[in-house]
């Protein structure tokens, strides 16, 4: 935990190229994910009527972009998993296989131009070169454009004791304050948000390269974090102790059970 920028993160990382250059999870195999993508497109289309072009970072098989394409938007995806990017391209969802960063953003600007909307859903907290990604977003977004960042919300992790979400693929655990601090550093300013059911409680935070009037609900969320002391190390320390107590209670329960024990895990 950094007391200056209020970011919570893992103390060690695994190289992103090792983790994501070949990936197994494909968005299109989940009916829930497909329906959510449809709603996501409808919501952004209604909120930001001036949008004509969309770029998605970590676009996977293009399930989300497919919905935008149906509605006539110019689209482009970027995904580090070559096997999945290949699948998306076969389905005519133009996808660049690679890791998005500042250098790639410069190439995209030449070939695609500046998009009106840049989307990064559940990816920003997963990579160690996070500053280069945000620099790339700032370099690429239209001056009147919108950036939509979806992430598992720190408050939901703490409230639900969701320590199962803390592992090597998830490096950062953002609050509204911490991710806003990061983007503000590179000239992107939060102005609104929506709740998301993904990952057990996420938010979609909207940024602009221009300082816009904050929505009332965003101001309320800022005040909520202050009241809950979400960006206080003591809050995180208490969460850590609760996780350990929960683990100990579960171990005790399992050890006291008689007979066979069956486990089932799902993602």
Task: Identify the function of each model-found stretch.
Residues 1, 6-87, 162, 167, ...:
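Extended interfacial segments that mediate partner engagement and assembly in macromolecular machines
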Residues 119:
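A conserved beta-strand element that flanks and buttresses the S-adenosyl-L-methionine
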Residues 147-172, 176-178, 183:
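Short, glycine-/aromatic-enriched active-site segment of Class I SAM-dependent methyltransferases
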Residues 188-199:
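Conserved S-adenosyl-L-methionine
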């Amino acid at each position: 935990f950094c007391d200056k920028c209020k970011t919570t993160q893992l103390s060690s990382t695994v190289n992103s190229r090792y983790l994501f250059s070949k990936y197994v999870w494909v968005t299109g195999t989940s009916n829930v994910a497909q329906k959510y993508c449809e709603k996501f497109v409808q919501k952004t289309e209604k909120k930001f009527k001036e949008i004509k072009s969309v770029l998605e970072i970590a676009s996977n098989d293009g399930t989300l972009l497919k919905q935008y394409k149906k509605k006539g938007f110019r689209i482009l995806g970027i995904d580090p998993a070559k096997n999945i990017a290949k699948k998306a391209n076969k389905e005519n969802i133009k996808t660049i296989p690679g890791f998005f960063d500042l250098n790639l953003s410069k190439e995209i600007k030449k070939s695609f131009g500046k998009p009106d909307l840049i989307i990064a859903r559940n990816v920003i907290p997963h990579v160690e070169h996070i500053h280069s990604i945000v620099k790339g977003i700032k370099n690429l977004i239209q001056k009147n454009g919108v950036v939509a960042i979806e992430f598992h919300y720190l408050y939901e992790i703490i409230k639900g004791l969701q320590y199962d979400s803390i592992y090597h693929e998830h490096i950062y655990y953002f609050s509204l304050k911490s991710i806003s601090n990061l983007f503000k550093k590179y000239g992107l300013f939060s102005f609104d948000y929506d709740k998301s059911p993904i990952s057990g409680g996420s938010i979609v935070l909207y940024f602009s390269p221009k300082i816009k009037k904050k929505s009332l609900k965003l101001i309320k969320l800022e005040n909520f974090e202050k009241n809950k002391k979400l960006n206080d190390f003591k809050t995180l320390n208490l969460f850590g102790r609760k996780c350990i107590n929960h683990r100990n209670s579960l171990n005790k329960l399992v050890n006291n059970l008689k007979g066979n024990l069956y486990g089932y895990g799902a993602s």
